[in-house]
Amino acid sequence: MICRKKQIIAAPFFALLLLFLTPNKVHSQRYLADIDSSFFIKDTVRPVIKRFENLRITGYIQPQFQKAQSDGSPSFSGGNFSQFSSSRFMLRRARVKIDYVLPSKSRYPKALFSFQIDATERGVIVRDMFLKLFETKNNVLSMTAGLFARPFGYEVNLSSAFRETPERGRMSQILMPGERDIGIMFSYEPQEKKHKLSHIKVDIGFFNGQGLSGTTDFDDHKDLITRLFIKPYSFNKLDLSGGVSYLRGGWKNGTKYVYESGKASNGDNIFVVDSSMANLGKSSPRHYYGADAQLKLKH
């Protein structure tokens, strides 16, 4: 059987950043579950919105035109083409986000509430809905609970406003479809820049595992996801950063068949099936290991 890949030419027009109730100098949110740094720029907030300085409403849209080789071509991101169409205009993303920060007596917040929707011609879905609580004594710990991006890898958490391309890599889309999941996460990230470990961030969280593919968790198996990230170090005109990630989870077996890698009689690598009835209802392991590094040239 010969499989042919149908190529799709995508031409994103532009990304429009719509900012409301923001300071004159834009400090946007680079990572999906982080706090917007503009909350701390008190002296640049316009007096007319002084009353709402702890509230941010932001958004952006990414209109797109796509041309495929034939009608009804499958598309990995954005949905398949309709039966009688090989070209289309579409809204790849149209986001509106509301962030509210509960201030503390210090310059750092007590809590962050974040809510984001994606409203396109395909419907309206919730992308983020989480509460982040900060430890205010030493300002190094936080807890995040709700629907938010899973802390695995660099690209999964990187906002599309900062990526070089509109879409994440195919690997990220396959392993982490939708990027988000429901769970709880604990983070170590010193807020004070003078702290000796201010360049380190550690996340560890527990998640349902199915992401946005279902309305509820379909089994009792949860995903453990953790990530150690080294924030950028500057060397002249270069910034170097990196991290390591680990996911340990599983799926409940709906059948008695379990496939594992093995060896054939001639030494070839094959999948070997185990059809024992004891496999029914057990957990099939899902373990991911990741490492990433970023090098940025300032110019």
Task: Spell out what each predicted region is.
Residues S213-H299:
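Surface-exposed beta-loop-beta
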Residues Q29-F40, T44-P47, E155, M176, ...:
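Surface-exposed, low-hydrophobicity segments enriched in Gly/Pro/acidic/Ser residues
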Residues M1-Y31:
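Bacterial Sec-dependent N-terminal signal peptides
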Residues I9, D71, G78, E164, ...:
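A generic membrane alpha-helix/interface feature
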Residues R46, K50-Q69, S77, F81-L212, ...:
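Outer membrane beta-barrel
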Residues I2, K25-Q62, Q69-D71:
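N-terminal periplasmic/intermembrane-space "pro-region" immediately following the signal or transit peptide
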Residues D71-G72, V156-S159, G254-V258:
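Short aromatic-enriched loop/helix-cap "lid" or pocket-rim segments at secondary-structure transitions
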